[in-house]
């Protein structure tokens, strides 16, 4: 049976003053162990938790961002399937926007660094094709639903 994990693809909209436009930036965390890969916050589902509860708890634990500091974006949910440490894994991601683009990120010991990145740079850091695709799909979803 596949391991099940859930997380949030967290983003902010940063104003670019000179061009009077906004840029979407994604939050990626760098793992402290293994190959030091970059991903959004995520973690394993605990007994009695819903998938979304898991995603919110893991975001608070790994990045110090609480549920009240986020807006979950309706209509976007992606399920990634891959092999991690020789075991099948399923990770479900939702999109979430920080309410304050200057929110403080407080890393747990599981991570050693974080970065806010525009799509192209985020995809370069995300080493796994499934994660790159999820970031691209999230960006496309946000651009297509912008008001």
From Swiss-Prot:
Q: Which GO terms describe its biological process?
A: AMP biosynthetic process; ATP biosynthetic process
Query: Which parts of the sequence form the motif Nudix box?
Result: 43-64
Per its UniProt entry, which superkingdom is the organism in? Eukaryota
Q: Sites of the modification N-acetylalanine?
A: 2
Matching CDD domains, A to Z? NUDIX_Ap4A_Nudt2 (cd03428)
Q: How does the cofactor bind to this protein, according to its record?
A: Divalent metal ions.
Q: Which Pfam families match?
A: NUDIX
Q: Write down the required cofactor(s).
A: a divalent metal cation
Q: Which reaction does it catalyse?
A: P(1),P(4)-bis(5'-guanosyl) tetraphosphate + H2O = GMP + GTP + 2 H(+); a 5'-end CoA-ribonucleoside in mRNA + H2O = a 5'-end phospho-adenosine-phospho-ribonucleoside in mRNA + (R)-4'-phosphopantetheine + 2 H(+); a 5'-end FAD-phospho-ribonucleoside in mRNA + H2O = a 5'-end phospho-adenosine-phospho-ribonucleoside in mRNA + FMN + 2 H(+)
From which residue to which does the signal peptide run? none
The UniProt entry, under InterPro entries, shows: Nudix_hydrolase (IPR020476), NUDIX_hydrolase-like_dom_sf (IPR015797), NUDIX_hydrolase_CS (IPR020084), NUDIX_hydrolase_dom (IPR000086), Nudix_hydrolase_domain (IPR051325), Tetra_PHTase (IPR003565)
Q: Which family does it belong to?
A: Belongs to the Nudix hydrolase family.
The protein's job, in short, is: Catalyzes the asymmetric hydrolysis of diadenosine 5',5'''-P1,P4-tetraphosphate (Ap4A) to yield AMP and ATP. Exhibits decapping activity towards FAD-capped RNAs and dpCoA-capped RNAs in vitro.
| Entry protein name | Bis(5'-nucleosyl)-tetraphosphatase [asymmetrical]
Q: What species does this protein belong to?
A: Bos taurus (Bovine)
State the organism's lineage: Eukaryota, Metazoa, Chordata, Craniata, Vertebrata
């Amino acid at each position: 049976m596949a391991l099940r994990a859930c997380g949030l693809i967290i983003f902010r909209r940063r104003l670019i003053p000179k061009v009077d436009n906004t840029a979407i930036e994604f939050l990626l965390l760098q793992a402290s162990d293994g190959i030091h890969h970059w991903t959004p916050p995520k973690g394993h589902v605990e007994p009695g938790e819903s998938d979304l509860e898991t995603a919110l708890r893991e975001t608070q634990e790994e990045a110090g961002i609480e549920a009240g500091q986020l807006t979950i974006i309706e209509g976007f949910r992606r399920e990634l399937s891959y092999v991690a440490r020789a075991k099948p894994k399923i990770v479900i991601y939702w999109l979430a926007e920080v309410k304050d683009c200057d929110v403080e990120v407080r890393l747990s010991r599981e991570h050693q660094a974080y970065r806010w990145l525009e799509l192209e740079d985020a995809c370069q850091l995300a080493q796994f094709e499934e994660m790159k695709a999820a970031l691209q799909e999230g960006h496309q979803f946000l651009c297509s639903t912008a008001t």
